[in-house]
Amino acid sequence: MSDIENKNENLELELEDNTILSNLFGINDRNLSLIEQINQVKIQYRGNKIKISGNKKSIFETKKTILNLFKEAQNGAEIDEDRIRDNKSLISINTKTDKQME
């Protein structure tokens, strides 16, 4: 990896519906911890504001994961480890496909 890919960056998100966050974050923030572990990022939040820290690619994938899972939670889905891992797999496949098309 180049120095640019290893450089830590930050991204802030704001999610509009606080009632969904407990489902998204999980009991004792278990879902957030899993997302951090899978994507090798650090996630901090206060209320509906989320800060993601890590390398650029990991931040991008984490943002996509959180937004996808948030939409699923809005539609009534229970967010659990399997759903998080499935979402990560889809994002990884789409990212690889996008790079191949470039």
Regions found by a protein language model. Give the residues of each.
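Interdomain "pre-motor" coupling segment immediately N-terminal to P-loop NTPase/helicase cores
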Residues: 44-102
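A short, structured beta-strand/loop element
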Residues: 36-44
